UniProtKB/Swiss-Prot annotation:
InterPro entries: 11S_seedstore_CS (IPR022379), 11S_seedstore_pln (IPR006044), Cupin_1 (IPR006045), RmlC-like_jellyroll (IPR014710), RmlC_Cupin_sf (IPR011051), Seed_Storage-Functional (IPR050253). It comes from Arabidopsis thaliana. The modification Phosphoserine is found at residue 314. GO terms for biological process: cellular response to abscisic acid stimulus; response to abscisic acid; seed maturation. This is 12S seed storage protein CRA1. The keyword Phosphoprotein applies. The gene is CRA1. Gene3D superfamilies: Jelly Rolls.
Length: 472
């Protein structure tokens, strides 16, 4: 009897553990059955706008079928001149792209020291007991950012942006909700360290909207005063209870943070030294505190594919930026001229989120059933998801078409349907002949006519693109 009881207890324990594991996998993986059975895709626009004093945050509905299938959410930050996006952190990994403008970015990585120190003493605006108090400011790393920069941010790392230029600073970000690092539900949750959001938490669909306040607001003023060793009045000011400026505020006067000079302003010796050592470390000296998290994709000289008459494509993966291995995301930047075509391809191991930064293009996407689920025009500011395995072709219809793709794998791989490195090139002629019921001569043309690997001209003989007419 005791043996039966022990066996039942053991089985019950296994059952509980299995259900817990299954629940965790369901939370971090696909939540709904057949949510990637997509029969139609659409070019998406923002569904909500959070307005602030010096800018706005535009949020896409992450419950849209194609974004839910991809396990991501998407947002666009528009920061006006002298606008400061107050520090916040998310429950998910984030990959951002600077679509327009320039500015400053700072991160606060837990456990890391303040490596930026002011060489001159700082005198605050207040004086204590008749004596002026002087000290040197110290803080963590501050970087210059510009158009084309791709920025990797790990979960829980507080981040802020400042626009020190004259035009708006536009940053688009993808949040990996399905990441193993997200221990909450599949909703993006910003945690604000400063400021308030009177419009509420629009990131969470279906939840009653209440004004979103910063973290300090939830603690008692006495607790804040004791923890920071400040007076009660200052502690209450940290809570921003009567501050309705939003999450992007306007800086009055100069913004005097410690920052390195711009690249063109650095001494020539420093730039030559960096050039001799290269831009990539050997991996031994890079720690979490000093890890490089930014790389620029707008330099054609560093492109992976470049044709002066057609355009260029640049990729960014964990081999270029090692921190991407940790957040398991990567990026691609494309810029093509009118009538240039990106040959049909599919992502072998990742979903892709395509955001148009400039121009227009005609895009076709085909699903696993061989059905065309999207055939339309996409233009600046629109977004479309391309799920794993779905084939896609892009053709520029404006003078220049530029886009950025965020991919849900640190080393995303593509396969092409046409071209010198395509799947058709790898097939024997006999397989093509019998598979498509065409002659050996036609099979040779199918296999060898396209010499390019990625980019080609979409214009050609009048017969291109027309159905083949059967002989009478």
């Amino acid at each position: 009897m005791a043996r039966v009881s022990s066996l039942l207890s053991f089985c019950l324990t296994l059952l509980i553990l299995f259900h817990g594991y299954a629940a965790q996998q369901g939370q971090q993986g696909q939540q709904f059955p057949n949510e990637c059975q997509l029969d139609q895709l659409n070019a998406l626009e923002p569904s909500h706008v959070l307005k602030s004093e010096a800018g706005r945050i535009e949020v896409w509905d992450h419950h849209a079928p194609q974004l839910r299938c991809s396990g991501v959410s998407f947002a666009r930050y528009i920061i006006e001149s002298k606008g400061l996006y107050l520090p916040s952190f998310f429950n998910t990994a984030k990959l951002s792209f600077v679509a327009k403008g320039r500015g400053l970015m700072g991160k606060v990585i837990p456990g890391c020291a303040e490596t930026f120190q002011d060489s001159s003493e700082f005198q605050p605006r207040f004086e204590g007991q008749g004596q002026s108090q002087r000290f040197r400011d110290m803080h963590q790393k501050v970087e210059h950012i510009r158009s084309g920069d791709t920025i990797a941010t790990t979960p829980g790392v507080a981040q802020w942006f400042y626009n020190d230029g004259q035009e708006p600073l536009v940053i688009v970000s993808v949040f990996d909700l399905a990441s193993h690092q997200n221990q909450l539900d599949r909703n993006p949750r910003p945690f604000y360290l400063a400021g308030n959001n009177p419009q509420g938490q629009v990131w969470l669909q279906g939840r009653e909207q209440q004004p979103q306040k910063n973290i300090f607001n939830g603690f008692g003023p006495e607790v804040i005063a004791q923890a920071l060793k400040i007076d009660l009045q200052t502690a209450q000011q940290l809570q921003n209870q009567d501050d309705n400026r939003g999450n992007i505020v306007r800086v009055q006067g100069p913004f005097g943070v410690i920052r390195p000079p711009l690249r063109g302003q650095r001494p020539q010796e420093e730039e030559e030294e960096e050039g001799r050592h290269g831009r990539h470390g050997n991996g031994l000296e890079e720690t979490i505190c000093s890890a490089r998290c930014t790389d620029n994709l707008d330099d054609p000289s560093r492109a992976d594919v470049y044709k002066p008459q057609l355009g260029y494509i640049s990729t960014l993966n964990s081999y270029d930026l090692p921190i991407l291995r940790f957040i398991r995301l990567s990026a691609l930047r494309g810029s093509i001229r009118q009538n240039a075509m990106v040959l049909p391809q599919w992502n072998a191991n990742a979903n892709a989120i395509l955001y148009v930064t400039d121009g227009e293009a005609q895009i076709q996407i085909v699903n696993d059933n061989g059905n065309r689920v999207f055939d339309g025009q996409v233009s600046q500011g629109q977004l479309i998801a391309v799920p794993q395995g779905f084939s896609v072709v892009k053709r520029a219809t404006s003078n220049r078409f530029q886009w950025v793709e965020f991919k849900t794998n640190a080393n995303a791989q593509i396969n092409t349907l046409a071209g010198r490195t395509s799947v058709l090139r790898g097939l024997p002629l006999e397989v093509i002949t019998n598979g498509f019921q065409i002659s050996p001569e036609e099979a040779r043309r199918v296999k060898f006519n396209t010499l390019e690997t990625t980019l080609t001209h979409s214009s050609g003989p009048a017969s291109y693109g027309r159905p083949r007419v059967a002989a009478a």
